[in-house]
Regions:
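Non-catalytic positions within long, well-ordered alpha-helices that form the structural scaffold/packing
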Residues: 99-102, 193, 212
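Metabolite-binding pocket within alpha/beta catalytic cores that recognizes anionic/polar moieties
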Residues: 1-147
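Zn-dependent metallopeptidase/amidohydrolase metal-coordination segment
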Residues: 202-240
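Active-site/ligand-binding-proximal alpha/beta "capping" segment
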Residues: 162-198
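Short acidic/polar active-site loop segments enriched in Thr and Asp
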Residues: 104-105, 198, 217
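His/Asp/Glu-rich mid-to-C-terminal helical/loop segments that flank catalytic regions of hydrolases
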Residues: 229-267
């Protein structure tokens, strides 16, 4: 990151005369959801002074600002991961940018692996708590974090109602953050399951922490795109993750649209 946050915010505001109340971070293979934004103004990351570029397939690298069902929104298509070599400051930069743009509600989406056989690929899961399985801070056994400032009960309620309204099966569970970029071993998946995890992925928790510190209301929804290692015998590929996310895209998009339409009910 070479530019100042103030410069980045000023540039985005100069490109789009929108003061978004809600931000959505789109995970692997979910970038097409930005097409639902009405009057969407696209701001490529490469145009923002000093803003980094994502390197992972399925992350296009642009902000989309506009309206969705009457709610002013900004969507980020493309995120940054520690395994790409970025530091935490860069990984959480979009969250800080959203905050400076006036965002109050943050919806994080991701593609994750299912650690439980009953949650098959294509399952949508609202995250009620998280585990830090990276061991970056210490070697203690990870603990489940379910504080409301990281996982808004109000937004989880709206997500559940939106799923019911649209006849979408939305599970709830605990997301385990692993460092990546290699997929986890069967032994690691067994431990995550024992610790109470339901899904595992390589992103999102740094964003949850940053947004929580900034006072945003946070909702995280995972698309379980594959079984994690050892749950079934088939190997895992990134291509499978992107394909599964695309297949679930219609349901996911419908759910997100409904959530955003009703998100003002928590304010």
């Amino acid at each position: 990151m070479t530019g100042s946050l103030e410069t980045m915010v000023s540039y985005v505001k100069s490109r789009a005369n929108v003061s978004p109340a809600t931000a959505v971070v789109l995970g692997s293979g979910l970038g097409h959801m930005a097409e639902n934004v009405e009057g969407g103004i696209k701001v490529p990351y490469g145009d923002i002074p000093g803003y980094p570029q994502p390197t992972v397939e399925g992350h296009s690298g642009e902000l989309i600002l506009g309206n969705l069902r009457g709610e002013k929104v900004v969507m980020a298509s493309g995120r940054f991961h520690l395994y790409e070599g970025w530091d935490l400051e860069t990984v959480t930069l979009p969250i800080k940018l959203f905050h400076e743009l006036g965002v109050k509600n943050l919806i994080l989406t991701n593609s994750a692996g299912s650690v439980r056989v009953q949650n098959s690929p294509g399952t949508l899961m609202a995250i009620t708590a998280h585990l830090d399985f990276t061991y970056q801070e210490n070697s203690d056994t990870p603990l489940i974090v379910n504080e409301d400032r990281y996982h808004s009960a109000g937004l989880l309620h709206i997500a559940g109602e939106s799923a019911e309204r649209n006849n979408i099966d939305l599970k709830e569970g605990v997301y385990a953050w692993a460092l990546g970029p290699s997929y986890e071993t069967p032994a690691e998946i067994d431990l995550i399951r024992e610790l109470g995890g339901h899904a595992v992925g390589m992103s999102t928790v740094p964003e949850i922490r940053a947004a929580g510190e900034l006072g945003m209301k946070i909702l995280t929804i995972s698309c379980l795109t594959n079984y994690a290692a050892g749950v079934v015998e088939a190997p895992i590929t990134h291509e499978e993750v992107i394909a599964s996310a695309a297949e679930a895209g219609e349901r996911f998009g419908k759910l997100l649209t409904s959530i955003i339409e009703h998100i003002g009910e928590t304010e």
